[in-house]
Amino acid sequence: MKKTLSVLFTAFSFCVIGFTQVAFAADLDNGEKVFSANCAACHAGGNNAIMPDKTLKKDVLEANSMNGIDAITYQVTNGKNAMPAFGGRLVDEDIEDAANYVLSQSEKGW
């Protein structure tokens, strides 16, 4: 009985991990589309056309405590300084997907 439960649990875990990775990849694809349509005008290539020292590069995100999904989604939703708020214009899922895309690109070096 224990062995059967162990095998079932292991199989279930692999299924969950597999589905999560597929969903995450799809989220990055959507995030890229959302970013291209809404963010790239100011942040093309991870740069910042308005405030050149506030790029989306990994080291700058870390230095400004913006290297997490919550921090990025909060700023995108609410805006800050010259950055407009996108809450109300974009659904939460699109904002989160764009945040995941930004973090993914920052890890790759844009």
Curated annotation (Swiss-Prot):
Family annotation (Pfam families):
Cytochrome_CBB3 (PF13442)
What Gene3D superfamilies does the entry give? Answer: Cytochrome c-like domain (1.10.760.10)
Q: What's in the keyword line of the UniProt record? A: Chloroplast, Electron transport, Heme, Iron, Metal-binding, Photosynthesis, Plastid, Signal, Thylakoid, Transport
Gene symbol of the encoding locus: petJ
Output this protein's name.
Cytochrome c6
Give the species this sequence originates from.
Answer: Porphyra purpurea
Q: Which domain of life is it from?
A: Eukaryota
Picking any one GO biological process from the record gives: photosynthesis
Signal peptide, first to last residue? 1-25
In the record, the note on similarity to other proteins reads:
Belongs to the cytochrome c family. PetJ subfamily.
Principal localization reads plastid
Question: Where is this protein localized, as stated in its record?
Answer: Plastid, Chloroplast thylakoid lumen
Q: How is it modified after translation?
A: Binds 1 heme c group covalently per subunit.
Q: HAMAP family of this UniProt entry?
A: Cytc_PetJ (MF_00594)
Q: Mind listing the GO molecular function terms for this protein?
A: electron transfer activity; heme binding; iron ion binding
